[in-house]
Amino acid sequence: KFGGYVRSYRDEKTGRDMFVQEDYRSVIAVPYDIPVLGYGNNTVNSLRIWDAEPVNTFNLNSFDKGDYQKAIEEENLAKNIVEVLYPNDNHYAGKELRLKQQYFFVSASVQRAVDRYKSMNNVGSEMCIRDSNGDVKNIYKKVTFQLNDTHPTVAVAELMRILMDENGLEWDEAWDITTKTVAYTNHTIMAEALEKWPIELFSRLLPRIYQIVEEINRRFVEEIKAKYPGNQEKVRKMAIIYDGQVKMANLAIVAGYSVNGVAKLHTEILKKQELRDFYEMMPEKFNNKTNGITQRRFLKHANPLLSDWITDKIGDGWVTDLSQLEKLMLYVDDPKAQQDFMQIKYKNKVRLAKYIKENNGIDVDPNSIFDVQVKRLHEYKRQLLNILHVMYLYNQIKRNPDYDMVPRTFIFGAKAAAGYKIAKQTIKLINNVANVINNDASIKGKIKVVFIENYRVSNGEIIFAAADVSEQISTASKEASGTGNMKFMLNGAITLGTMDGANVEIVNEVGAENAQIFGLSSDEVIRFENEGGYDPMEIFNNDQEIRDVLMELINGKYSPEDTEMFRDIYNSLLNNDGGRRADTYFILKDFRSYAEAQRKIDERYRDTNGWAKTVMTNTAKAGKFSSDRTIEEYATEIWKLTKTPVEM
């Protein structure tokens, strides 16, 4: 139900205040189930997805009156909700559609879960609830809503609405049940990604839901004031509704019985920095669940050559117990095993080179170092640092045609949000640089640059298997975890990165000698930020080579048709803009350290045996990063489930 207003009245029989949403527009949620098969365990789960259909497809009355738009209004409402997931929200209409989408999917899913729970109270039913008897008051014993980031957080208020308005529970009882049923996973340290909605939009579109959120906020603010008398700063930071905004992360934390980060460093930063006030007030909620990946897709399926080799060496137990990869450590010094491992890598590089030729029309040398950065494009992930270094390296070769280096193929893959202008400009820069470098015969193929379009799981599988170097170069303290780093590690690539996100745990597993770490630490970044940043103009003025690279952004070298094309990127690195600091993500501050790390990669690659040992060690030490381990931690520590044998 969208829009309308809420009418309240007193029920004479029960003496309760009742709330009814009226004059609303609604859509019908139509379920579809996708079976998800377990690996060799006779288990099939269902992934429930939803389509939206109008209550009335055509309003003949409106049509007869000549109001043709009104006649198909309900049909368009339903169609728009499911047409494009997460549209551009740089404008009001986009924000409204996003909120509609979130509530549509959440409401359909929560309603279905509650109805299913209430109906499943018979032995032999699809979800036997003998100890609960389908009484909605006991739903928390069998159901958890794991809020995966802030997008589904409206589920808190929707569950409250269902418990109170549809099942007759009083507020206190409904809140007690909700706070035993909801758990929250935080996936970002970036403040702007912690979703907020304007009160005007939220209350107009979801009037009953807003009433409930408003009451949750009122009661929680009273708790804050009781615990921290006179501390308005605590209220400002922790209130769910404040300064005209509904803060969804705050709602998730207040309602959730568990709040987890997705890497150890991420969780510590949440506790000490971003969510410090909440951690101080409710420390028992906070815990860590480091992300993982499934080896069955990203090794067994994606890299059959390596998969078969591993099974030949240690058996196939690793397919369901990735910790068994540790047995490969017996082979990391074996010359024959090293040769076999690197031959598999070469064949996978040939496969990727073929894909690049077919899709990009670029010839790349499988004997070159495949240096890969594929991930969502965001300034904090610093694809810009990578391409600026490529420009720097190109300048070195142009100045000295005999520049000694192992040929390098820089491979990018990324998508940017529709309204993220500087991210789109960065993609354009990468492609323009690629066009210049790849068509310069004078550098004799020492560098090639490839931007793989439409980066996705299917071409990712080809990329992960072929990478020599895994670029994980986010500004320290900004990446929650990352999982690409794990996929590359599993397939035998060295991590070139900062001590950020799950990189920290990767280094702990493989040892610092089997990674290439550079740049500011998270503590150093946070200290700079607390002190107002640093002055990038000092680097610009004192480092000629960096200055040359930056000037190429605005002198037309890579955009002869429009010298202003990359002006925004240039300005973002050197100039303060309103409340935004120059070089917000410390690209220039880390540039020299990054360039030195890249030089060491070149040096290490020349040591054939040493390189083989390093990348084999990365595969052997990847056991911790299985999603099997991650999910088991959620199941035992958050959902409080116990393992049940499956009949085979």
Regions found by a protein language model. Give the residues of each.
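A conserved ligand/cofactor-binding region detector
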Residues: 1-126, 130-648
